[in-house]
């Protein structure tokens, strides 16, 4: 028998069509068009324009040329405001850590009842959801301009982040040590002191330093709205078009942030 006569090659027309594949193609095409429309609408809303960048380029060149040479005659003022910026970040972060530390044990599933856990977690999420600048405006209306409202705003927002990180570290401890102490009749406080805290203390310090890094940058931004520090005098010099002094502040901010990040990073790498 001829093999060619008995073979029944599969033809393209014999392959059953899959209606679902067509539906998927239509859905994907529709989704793609919607995404493109959203991006087009968003670009239009923010008035994105390469033409504006081109037309404004001479202004940018004037700004850059005005920054040189830097006016280092203000170094004493810059030093004072740099110290204030560090103090803002330090006090704000420390106050946040003091409050977040006990609350974090109330926000961990393995150290708090369910109803307390949900209440404290909701508080952490709520204060994290509100930006530091919004808190700053609230406290400025309360106590007036100056470093104090900026520090309070920084502290309140930091409580949410530190509390979340602290509580997650607590939930990640080795349960074996906890169960060992509980089996010999240790109280809840004793269990936290001898089984949980030794496991999370290095993480707490690391998270504190990490938040301090962030708050250095936050302190600069808060200064732009009247909280003092480098950001405040930066806004003043920008408003008076003293770009040679602005360059000094930009250099100072760059050195400050990079130095704090490097130092904090080394300490955290040794802790973890």
What are these regions (language model features)?
Residues 1-94, 106, 114:
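N-terminal, non-cleaved signal-anchor transmembrane helix
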Residues 43, 247-272:
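C-terminal transmembrane helix and the adjacent membrane-cytosol boundary/short C-terminal tail
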Residues 79-87, 120-127, 209, 213, ...:
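Alpha-helical membrane-interface segments at transmembrane helix boundaries
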Residues 93-101, 105, 109, 133, ...:
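Hydrophobic positions within alpha-helical transmembrane segments of bacterial inner-membrane proteins
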Residues 103-136, 165-168:
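Cytoplasmic-entry segments and transmembrane alpha-helices of multi-pass inner-membrane transporters
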Residues 124-158:
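Generic hydrophobic transmembrane alpha-helix motif, especially the helices
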Residues 141, 218-253, 272:
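Glycine-rich helix-loop "coupling/hinge" segments at transmembrane-helix boundaries
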Residues 145-211, 262:
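Membrane-cytosol interface at the C-terminal ends of specific transmembrane alpha-helices
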């Amino acid at each position: 028998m001829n093999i060619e006569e008995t073979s029944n090659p599969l033809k393209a027309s014999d392959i059953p069509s899959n209606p679902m594949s067509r539906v998927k193609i239509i859905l994907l095409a529709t989704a793609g068009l919607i995404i493109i429309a959203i991006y087009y609408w968003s670009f239009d809303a923010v008035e994105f324009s390469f033409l504006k960048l081109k037309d404004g380029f001479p202004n940018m060149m004037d700004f850059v040329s005005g920054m040189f040479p830097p006016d280092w005659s203000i170094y004493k003022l810059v030093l004072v405001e740099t110290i204030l910026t560090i103090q803002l970040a330090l006090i704000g972060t420390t106050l946040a850590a003091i409050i977040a530390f006990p609350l974090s044990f109330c926000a961990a599933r393995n150290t708090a009842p369910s109803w307390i856990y949900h209440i404290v977690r909701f508080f952490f999420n709520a204060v994290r959801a509100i930006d530091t600048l919004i808190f700053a405006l609230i406290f400025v209306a309360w106590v007036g301009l100056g470093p104090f409202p900026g520090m309070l705003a920084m502290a309140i927002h930091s409580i949410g982040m530190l509390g979340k990180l602290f509580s997650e570290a607590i939930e990640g401890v080795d349960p074996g040590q906890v169960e060992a102490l509980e089996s010999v009749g240790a109280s809840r406080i004793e269990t936290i002191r001898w089984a949980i805290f030794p496991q999370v203390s290095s993480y707490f310090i690391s998270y504190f330093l990490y938040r301090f890094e962030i708050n250095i940058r936050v302190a600069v931004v808060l200064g732009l709205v009247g909280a003092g520090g480098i950001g405040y005098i930066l806004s003043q010099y920008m408003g008076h078009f003293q770009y040679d002094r602005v360059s000094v502040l930009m250099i100072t901010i760059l050195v400050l942030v990079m130095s704090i990040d490097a130092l904090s990073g080394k300490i955290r790498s040794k802790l973890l």
